[in-house]
Amino acid sequence: MIKLFVGLGNPGPEYEDTRHNAGFWWIDALARELKVQLVPERSYFGLMARASVRGENVWLLQPQTFMNLSGKSVGALARFFKIQPEEVLVVHDELDFEPGQVKLKRGGSHGGHNGLRDIHAQLGSADYWRLRIGIGHPGHKAEVANWVLKKPAPDQRQLIEDSIAHSLKAWPELQAGNMDKATLLIHTTKPPRPKPARPATAESDKG
């Protein structure tokens, strides 16, 4: 069962529409779905909302510490409400996936993502769930820092928004702890429409 949904990003209007804030976009969409409002909570160093879903408390969190200190916010809330690592879902941008791709996984390395690195340290465990939202890769490692802090092109932003909407369909399963079903929902996308068959030509008829 997921009790704490965390979206990673950087605070401030200058970062609002940058690729690194894809996790914030996901939490904003979930807050709209649940009809709750994220409000500042100084004790947890972030914007937080709480909802009751099927009699269970669910927390939504956007750390306001800047990306590299995200664990400070996540750890503070998780410790206070006694939420275990396996009850946490962290939604973040993923360089290794193209815009439009989204994948769910549990555990593993931080892969160089500084937000995840700090969450590892503050939770004392890597055994939490991650929802990885594809933002694409600039092609060269030296360009990554600049890439994640830039706005995606409109067509890329639309693909990211589509992947967020698609993955949100699985949030009730995530909350209920039906992780296999959630994974299937998230990882299954509609296949592209098949192209109509070419009409036979006179040459092909001849064999």
Swiss-Prot record:
Chain intervals with Low complexity compositional bias: 198-207
Localization per Swiss-Prot or TrEMBL: Cytoplasm
Database matches in CDD domains: PTH
Subcellular location, principal: cytoplasm
Enzyme class: hydrolase
Keywords assigned by UniProt, alphabetized: Cytoplasm, Hydrolase, RNA-binding, tRNA-binding
InterPro entries reported for this sequence: Pept_tRNA_hydro, Pept_tRNA_hydro_CS, Pept_tRNA_hydro_sf
Keyword Cytoplasm: yes
UniProt record, GO biological process: protein quality control for misfolded or incompletely synthesized proteins; rescue of stalled ribosome
Annotated segments matching region Disordered: 187-207
Superkingdom, taxonomy of origin: Bacteria
UniProt EC number: 3.1.1.29
Site for Discriminates between blocked and unblocked aminoacyl-tRNA, residues: 10
Cellular component terms (Gene Ontology): cytoplasm
Catalytic reaction annotation: an N-acyl-L-alpha-aminoacyl-tRNA + H2O = an N-acyl-L-amino acid + a tRNA + H(+)
Chain positions of site Stabilizes the basic form of H active site to accept a proton: 93
Record-linked HAMAP family: Pept_tRNA_hydro_bact
Known partners and oligomeric status: Monomer.
UniProt-listed PANTHER family: PEPTIDYL-TRNA HYDROLASE
Similarity remark: Belongs to the PTH family.
NCBIfam families xrefs: pth (TIGR00447)
Known role: Hydrolyzes ribosome-free peptidyl-tRNAs (with 1 or more amino acids incorporated), which drop off the ribosome during protein synthesis, or as a result of ribosome stalling.
Protein name from the UniProt record: Peptidyl-tRNA hydrolase
Protein source organism: Delftia acidovorans (strain DSM 14801 / SPH-1)
